[in-house]
């Protein structure tokens, strides 16, 4: 089996461009752009003057708007001036009416003073009556509150006594059950602890003390045994060293 031919034909781009020949003209060239027709300086001046003047229609519109605006300003001024005059007239009328009312009030004040004195005495009597009623209501409310607080305290004390009784009964039941269980264990013959279990919660502390003492004695015995073993090992090492030294001397 032969190898596959992976060669590619190389084409020189410059030679290909020469073979195509000169490129066709597409669109205007640079020379055409440079040789374009241009306006003279006089024509440019005329165009600038026209721009400064602006259009006639716009100028007419601005004139009309200015005229309308001036008319509206005049109307507004007239309204404001008329309103100021009318307001001044109204103020004068109000002043005159106040003067008349003050004169009438001065004449009526003398008559009203006597009426006010009688009304003041009546109002004082009413205030005293209302004060007495309020005191009575407060006294009643205080009595009710004291009676309600006493009843609440009694109910709380009853509840507390009931709770204490229920707790005591529950503890007694627990003690009875524990005593019954210990009796059963003693009947079965669990050993020397049966007599101690029958003696109740008072001897539990003694049992704990005995256990602590026994544990301490066991620890002491173990410590003594360890010390003896260490002493024996040390004495054996000394004997070996002494025997080795004697053999060397011989």
From Swiss-Prot:
Tell me the segments the record calls region Disordered: 18-250
What are the Low complexity biased-composition ranges? 103-121
The identity of this protein, by name, is Protein FAM133
* Domain of life of the native organism: Eukaryota
Report the sequence similarity comment from the record. Answer: Belongs to the FAM133 family.
State which gene encodes it: FAM133
Entry-linked InterPro entries: Fam133
Against PANTHER family, the record matches this protein to:
FAMILY WITH SEQUENCE SIMILARITY 133 MEMBER B-RELATED, PROTEIN FAM133
Q: Which organism is it from?
A: Gallus gallus
Enumerate composition-biased segments (Basic and acidic residues). Answer: 39-49, 59-80, 155-176, 214-224
Which stretches are tagged as biased composition: Basic residues?
Answer: 90-102, 130-143, 177-186, 225-242
